[in-house]
Protein backbone atom coordinates (compact mmCIF):
# COMPACT_ATOMS: atom_id res chain seq x y z
CA UNK A 1 0.00 0.00 0.00
CA UNK A 2 1.25 3.46 -0.90
CA UNK A 3 1.96 5.96 1.88
CA UNK A 4 -0.54 8.79 1.60
CA UNK A 5 1.35 11.36 3.66
CA UNK A 6 0.60 14.21 1.30
CA UNK A 7 2.37 17.54 1.54
CA UNK A 8 -0.06 20.05 3.03
CA UNK A 9 -0.18 22.75 5.68
CA UNK A 10 -0.06 21.13 9.11
CA UNK A 11 1.83 17.97 8.08
CA UNK A 12 4.76 17.01 10.34
CA UNK A 13 8.03 16.50 8.45
CA UNK A 14 11.49 15.24 9.40
CA UNK A 15 14.50 17.06 7.94
CA UNK A 16 16.81 14.56 6.22
CA UNK A 17 20.04 16.53 5.64
CA UNK A 18 21.79 19.69 6.70
CA UNK A 19 22.31 21.48 10.02
CA UNK A 20 18.76 20.60 11.16
CA UNK A 21 19.07 16.89 10.33
CA UNK A 22 16.56 14.58 12.10
CA UNK A 23 14.64 17.54 13.54
CA UNK A 24 10.87 17.63 13.21
CA UNK A 25 8.91 20.58 11.91
CA UNK A 26 5.43 21.42 10.65
CA UNK A 27 4.66 22.61 7.13
CA UNK A 28 3.24 26.10 7.58
CA UNK A 29 2.90 27.04 3.92
CA UNK A 30 3.68 25.68 0.46
CA UNK A 31 5.96 28.03 -1.49
CA UNK A 32 5.95 26.20 -4.85
CA UNK A 33 6.11 22.65 -6.24
CA UNK A 34 9.57 22.07 -4.76
CA UNK A 35 9.72 24.12 -1.55
CA UNK A 36 7.76 24.45 1.68
CA UNK A 37 7.84 26.73 4.71
CA UNK A 38 8.66 24.69 7.85
CA UNK A 39 8.59 25.70 11.52
CA UNK A 40 8.56 24.12 14.98
CA UNK A 41 8.08 26.66 17.80
CA UNK A 42 8.81 23.99 20.44
CA UNK A 43 12.39 23.54 19.19
CA UNK A 44 15.07 26.22 19.34
CA UNK A 45 16.74 25.78 15.93
CA UNK A 46 13.52 25.21 13.97
CA UNK A 47 12.41 28.78 13.29
CA UNK A 48 10.36 29.43 10.16
CA UNK A 49 12.47 28.68 7.09
CA UNK A 50 12.21 27.32 3.55
CA UNK A 51 13.02 23.64 2.96
CA UNK A 52 13.29 21.77 -0.32
CA UNK A 53 10.86 18.84 -0.61
CA UNK A 54 13.76 16.54 -1.48
CA UNK A 55 15.15 17.30 1.97
CA UNK A 56 12.04 16.46 4.03
CA UNK A 57 10.25 13.23 4.88
CA UNK A 58 6.51 13.66 5.51
CA UNK A 59 5.33 11.87 8.65
CA UNK A 60 1.92 10.34 9.34
CA UNK A 61 1.07 13.00 11.94
CA UNK A 62 -0.83 16.14 11.03
CA UNK A 63 -2.26 19.17 12.87
CA UNK A 64 -5.12 21.29 11.63
CA UNK A 65 -3.81 24.81 10.97
CA UNK A 66 -4.51 27.43 8.34
CA UNK A 67 -1.87 28.27 5.74
CA UNK A 68 0.73 30.77 6.94
CA UNK A 69 -0.63 30.82 10.50
CA UNK A 70 1.16 32.62 13.32
CA UNK A 71 3.77 30.94 15.51
CA UNK A 72 1.45 31.26 18.51
CA UNK A 73 -1.40 29.46 16.72
CA UNK A 74 0.97 26.71 15.58
CA UNK A 75 2.29 26.22 19.11
CA UNK A 76 -1.27 25.94 20.49
CA UNK A 77 -2.21 23.40 17.80
CA UNK A 78 0.88 21.29 18.55
CA UNK A 79 0.24 21.34 22.30
CA UNK A 80 -3.47 20.51 21.99
CA UNK A 81 -2.93 17.47 19.71
CA UNK A 82 0.35 16.38 21.41
CA UNK A 83 1.71 15.17 18.06
CA UNK A 84 5.35 15.73 19.02
CA UNK A 85 4.94 13.38 22.02
CA UNK A 86 3.20 10.82 19.79
CA UNK A 87 6.03 11.02 17.26
CA UNK A 88 8.66 10.70 20.01
CA UNK A 89 7.05 7.39 21.05
CA UNK A 90 7.20 5.83 17.56
CA UNK A 91 9.70 3.19 16.38
CA UNK A 92 10.97 5.56 13.67
CA UNK A 93 12.20 8.02 16.31
CA UNK A 94 14.01 5.47 18.51
CA UNK A 95 17.23 5.11 16.44
CA UNK A 96 17.53 8.90 16.11
CA UNK A 97 17.22 9.31 19.90
CA UNK A 98 19.85 6.60 20.48
CA UNK A 99 22.23 8.15 17.94
CA UNK A 100 21.81 11.59 19.50
CA UNK A 101 22.38 10.23 23.03
CA UNK A 102 25.51 8.38 21.86
CA UNK A 103 26.87 11.53 20.17
CA UNK A 104 26.29 13.61 23.32
CA UNK A 105 27.82 11.02 25.67
CA UNK A 106 31.31 11.40 27.09
CA UNK A 107 34.24 9.11 26.36
CA UNK A 108 33.84 7.37 29.72
CA UNK A 109 30.09 6.78 29.13
CA UNK A 110 30.86 5.17 25.76
CA UNK A 111 33.46 2.98 27.49
CA UNK A 112 30.88 1.95 30.11
CA UNK A 113 28.45 1.08 27.33
CA UNK A 114 31.03 -1.15 25.61
CA UNK A 115 31.80 -2.95 28.88
CA UNK A 116 28.09 -3.45 29.57
CA UNK A 117 27.53 -4.89 26.06
CA UNK A 118 30.42 -7.33 26.51
CA UNK A 119 29.15 -8.39 29.93
CA UNK A 120 25.61 -8.86 28.64
CA UNK A 121 26.86 -10.96 25.70
CA UNK A 122 29.06 -13.07 28.00
CA UNK A 123 26.23 -13.90 30.40
CA UNK A 124 23.74 -14.55 27.60
CA UNK A 125 26.20 -16.95 25.95
CA UNK A 126 26.99 -18.68 29.25
CA UNK A 127 23.31 -19.23 30.09
CA UNK A 128 22.61 -20.45 26.54
CA UNK A 129 25.52 -22.92 26.66
CA UNK A 130 24.40 -24.30 30.05
CA UNK A 131 20.86 -24.82 28.77
CA UNK A 132 22.19 -26.24 25.49
CA UNK A 133 24.09 -28.95 27.39
CA UNK A 134 20.91 -30.06 29.18
CA UNK A 135 18.55 -29.77 26.22
CA UNK A 136 20.37 -29.22 22.88
CA UNK A 137 18.78 -26.63 20.61
CA UNK A 138 21.73 -25.30 18.60
CA UNK A 139 22.12 -27.07 15.25
CA UNK A 140 25.69 -28.26 15.85
CA UNK A 141 24.78 -29.86 19.20
CA UNK A 142 21.75 -31.60 17.68
CA UNK A 143 23.82 -32.82 14.71
CA UNK A 144 26.56 -34.05 17.05
CA UNK A 145 24.00 -35.92 19.16
CA UNK A 146 22.63 -37.66 16.03
CA UNK A 147 26.15 -38.51 14.85
CA UNK A 148 27.09 -40.03 18.22
CA UNK A 149 23.86 -42.03 18.28
CA UNK A 150 24.56 -43.45 14.81
CA UNK A 151 28.22 -44.07 15.69
CA UNK A 152 27.20 -46.15 18.73
CA UNK A 153 25.13 -48.39 16.47
CA UNK A 154 27.99 -48.86 13.98
CA UNK A 155 30.79 -49.21 16.55
CA UNK A 156 29.04 -51.95 18.50
CA UNK A 157 29.93 -54.72 15.99
CA UNK A 158 33.27 -56.58 16.38
CA UNK A 159 34.27 -55.80 12.78
CA UNK A 160 33.81 -52.08 13.40
CA UNK A 161 35.95 -52.23 16.53
CA UNK A 162 38.67 -53.98 14.51
CA UNK A 163 38.54 -51.24 11.81
CA UNK A 164 38.78 -48.48 14.43
CA UNK A 165 41.81 -50.12 16.10
CA UNK A 166 43.47 -50.58 12.70
CA UNK A 167 42.90 -46.89 11.85
CA UNK A 168 44.33 -45.79 15.21
CA UNK A 169 47.42 -47.96 14.69
CA UNK A 170 47.93 -46.52 11.20
CA UNK A 171 47.64 -42.99 12.57
CA UNK A 172 50.21 -43.70 15.28
CA UNK A 173 52.56 -45.16 12.67
CA UNK A 174 52.16 -42.07 10.47
CA UNK A 175 52.87 -39.76 13.41
CA UNK A 176 55.95 -41.78 14.37
CA UNK A 177 57.19 -41.74 10.77
CA UNK A 178 56.63 -37.98 10.59
CA UNK A 179 58.64 -37.42 13.78
CA UNK A 180 61.51 -39.53 12.53
CA UNK A 181 61.58 -37.61 9.22
CA UNK A 182 61.81 -34.30 11.05
CA UNK A 183 64.64 -35.66 13.22
CA UNK A 184 66.54 -36.79 10.11
CA UNK A 185 65.98 -33.42 8.42
CA UNK A 186 67.18 -31.61 11.55
CA UNK A 187 70.32 -33.74 11.78
CA UNK A 188 71.22 -33.09 8.10
CA UNK A 189 71.26 -29.34 8.75
Swiss-Prot record:
GO terms for cellular component: cytosolic large ribosomal subunit. CDD domains: KOW_RPL14 (cd06088). Signal peptide: none annotated. Component of the large ribosomal subunit. The ribosome is a large ribonucleoprotein complex responsible for the synthesis of proteins in the cell. InterPro entries: KOW (IPR005824), Rib_uL2_dom2 (IPR014722), Ribosomal_eL14 (IPR039660), Ribosomal_eL14_dom (IPR002784), Ribosomal_eL14_KOW (IPR041985), Translation_prot_SH3-like_sf (IPR008991). Belongs to the eukaryotic ribosomal protein eL14 family. Keywords: Ribonucleoprotein, Ribosomal protein. Pfam families: KOW (PF00467), Ribosomal_L14e (PF01929). GO terms for molecular function: RNA binding; structural constituent of ribosome. This is Large ribosomal subunit protein eL14. GO terms for biological process: ribosomal large subunit biogenesis; translation.
Amino acid sequence: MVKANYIRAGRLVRILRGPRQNRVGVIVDIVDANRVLVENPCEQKMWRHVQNLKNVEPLKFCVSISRNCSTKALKEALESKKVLEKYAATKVRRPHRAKKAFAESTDFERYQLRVAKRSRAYWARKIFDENDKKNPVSWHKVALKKLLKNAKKVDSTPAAKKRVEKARAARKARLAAGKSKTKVAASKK
